[in-house]
């Protein structure tokens, strides 16, 4: 029985930068068609490997990944009748070289599949949509797309999604029906049915309800989720208590009326069908020194995830490290937002109008070491270079130091010495 939860991170610039603007193909008084082309390529190196899938040996690995997304979007406005919108696009993805440091991918995965295929209608206070599309709730603590892209390394390739494990070109839920109501300010909410075709997630179906109050000082939100079905054969191996699970959360994020202040927090309660209760929560505070050159910012966050907590579809939402905590830990070594408490400190500043630099520090402490010891510390240094409106570059260097090797209850193969990790991502959008 595989009890560990695993995920992979979105490249920061694809998730956060505005460079992926579509190219207009036709624009009339009421109708617009646009072409969407965006992608990423990455070079990766890890001095050490991690024993998650049984296909890795101790030592260094080098690999490459690439994704390309391409398709069309449209909007049609009718006076007094709202707007019809939709999209159809594909994603091609590939992994090369050794495959990633944990063996989720082995380096020979290639595939092209439909990514988004949805249709919807909206007016000023209501939106209805359905089809295959990405969904994010809050800042991604619970749901940030269906973005787990396992390759052929796990379960003899049974859950292969086509490679590019880190770049996660595939984020859309396979089937959705979504009703959104409310405005940008005051009360708003969502009613959603989501169906995943991701075998590494055991293909769950989810019913989701959210309620938020949005104001200038911040947003307060409630979320309720029920997992109504799973692929039972895979769920018995990966998530035996996922079907029937209920999850409730309360969250808040804002500046409390102080422009340089950042405050955020969320608490999630999870009830497993067998009666077990799990939980996860975090508190975060940050400050931007807006009067200083480069407007440096500093953030501290404490998060805790109980030993049996199922993190569902978490992912990077508002920033690098939220919620993939540590480039090595979140992608390859664990603890994957379960059975851990984490201290996190992040700093970031602008070197110029096109270049930002930052540092992310993490201290991981395992709650129940009988399930595996993922105690570790990690430091990641990164830069974001916006080359122009279409191209960006993200280099990152990380240092990861576990307390235990895999042979002593950890996950790093062969040694508990510190490991150096490096990556360079090239991201583009037209």
Predicted segment positions?
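Transmembrane beta-strand segments that form the barrel wall of outer-membrane beta-barrel proteins
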Residues: 161-162, 188-197, 220-228, 261-271, ...
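Extracellular/periplasmic loop regions
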Residues: 235-237, 264-268, 276-358, 408-410
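Beta-barrel outer-membrane channel/assembly domains of diderm bacteria
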Residues: 21-131, 135, 177-184, 254-257, ...
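Surface-exposed beta-loop-beta
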Residues: 207-292
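Outer membrane beta-barrel
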Residues: 66-198, 203-222, 282, 287-316
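Outer-membrane beta-barrel translocator domains and adjoining extracellular loop/strand segments
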Residues: 46-56, 97-104, 110, 140-147, ...
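Cleavable N-terminal export/targeting peptides
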Residues: 1-28
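Short secondary-structure boundary/capping elements
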Residues: 111, 171, 203, 243-247, ...
């Amino acid at each position: 029985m595989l009890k560990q939860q695993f995920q992979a991170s979105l490249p920061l610039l694809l998730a956060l930068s505005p460079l992926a603007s579509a190219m207009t193909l036709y624009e009339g008084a009421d109708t617009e068609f646009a072409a969407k082309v965006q992608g990423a390529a990455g070079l990766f190196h890890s001095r050490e490997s991690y024993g998650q899938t049984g296909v890795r040996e101790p030592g260094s690995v080098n690999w490459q990944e690439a994704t390309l997304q391409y398709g069309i979007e449209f909007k049609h406005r009718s006076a007094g009748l709202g707007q019809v919108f939709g999209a159809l696009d594909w994603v091609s993805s590939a992994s090369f070289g050794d495959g990633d440091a944990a063996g989720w991918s082995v380096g020979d995965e290639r595939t092209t599949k439909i990514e988004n295929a949805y249709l919807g209608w909206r007016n000023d206070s209501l939106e209805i949509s359905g089809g295959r599309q990405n969904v994010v709730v809050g800042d991604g603590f619970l749901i940030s797309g269906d973005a787990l892209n396992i390759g052929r390394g796990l379960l003899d390739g049974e859950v292969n999604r086509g490679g590019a494990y880190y770049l996660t070109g595939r984020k859309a839920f396979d089937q959705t029906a979504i009703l959104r109501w409310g405005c940008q300010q005051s009360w708003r909410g969502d009613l959603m049915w989501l169906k995943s075709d991701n075998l590494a997630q055991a293909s769950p179906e989810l019913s989701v309800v959210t309620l938020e109050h949005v104001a200038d000082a911040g947003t307060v939100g409630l979320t309720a989720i029920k997992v109504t079905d799973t692929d039972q054969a895979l769920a018995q191996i990966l998530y035996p208590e996922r079907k029937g699970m209920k999850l409730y959360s309360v969250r808040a994020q804002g500046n409390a009326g102080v422009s340089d202040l950042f405050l955020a927090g969320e608490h999630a309660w999870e009830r497993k069908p067998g009666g077990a209760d799990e939980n996860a929560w975090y508190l975060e505070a940050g400050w931007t020194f807006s009067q200083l050159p480069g407007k440096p910012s500093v953030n501290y966050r404490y998060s805790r995830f109980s030993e049996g907590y199922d993190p569902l579809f978490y992912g990077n939402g508002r920033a690098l490290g939220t919620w993939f905590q540590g480039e090595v830990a979140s992608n390859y070594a664990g603890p994957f937002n379960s059975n851990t408490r984490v201290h996190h400190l992040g700093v970031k500043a602008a070197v110029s109008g096109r270049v930002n630099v930052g540092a992310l520090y993490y201290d991981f402490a395992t709650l129940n070491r009988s399930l595996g010891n993922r105690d570790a510390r990690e430091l990641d240094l990164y830069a974001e270079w916006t080359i122009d409106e279409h191209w960006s570059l993200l280099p990152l260097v990380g240092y990861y130091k576990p307390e235990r090797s895999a042979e002593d209850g950890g996950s790093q193969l062969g040694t508990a010495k510190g490991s150096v990790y490096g990556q360079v991502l090239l991201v583009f959008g037209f």
